[in-house]
Amino acid sequence: MLLEKVRKTRENMEIVVDSGQETVEIDRSQYIGGSDIPIILGISGFTKPNKLAQLKNKVIPYENKKTLYTEFGHIFEPFIREVANKKFNMNTVPCCKTSEELGLRANCDGYDSENSLLLEVKTNNGEHEDKSDYIVQIHFYMAMYDVKKCILAEYGRTKEEEEIINVVV
């Protein structure tokens, strides 16, 4: 099974830590990453599994499109991480762990090696009740980083923030 292969090889996977200047971004078109897991399982509302397969196999061009929603998340993520670090007395930093052999990439929002835990930050419209897509992504990261704990920090955009985004979009 894939999980067994991850367990056997994860010690050899280098962890790339964010320098603090910008978010760690390992080429998303090359690897299967955490955000791909809900798509593969058919529980993503954004992309279908067959389209993901076409993208990863370069049948259709991969576009790393930035949207206002993703940009909002990138802007807020460091602030949310800072608040979570203080609240839970931890020191998470953005990291990426990649397995060339397995073609996997775990680009996590926060990893605290001392406390052996992860932080996953999500921003949404505040109406994301079914967390199954978040949970499968988190489980993937937990397997890649060999941790048993992850804190999900979720920020629901205010009505005013949603209105601004909708006007701009």
Where are these regions (language model features)?
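Nucleic-acid nuclease catalytic cores
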Residues: 70, 87-169
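Charged, glycine-rich intrinsically disordered N-terminal tails and low-complexity linkers that flank
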Residues: 1-75, 79, 87
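Short, well-ordered alpha-helical scaffold segments within catalytic/effector domains
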Residues: 77-81, 135-138
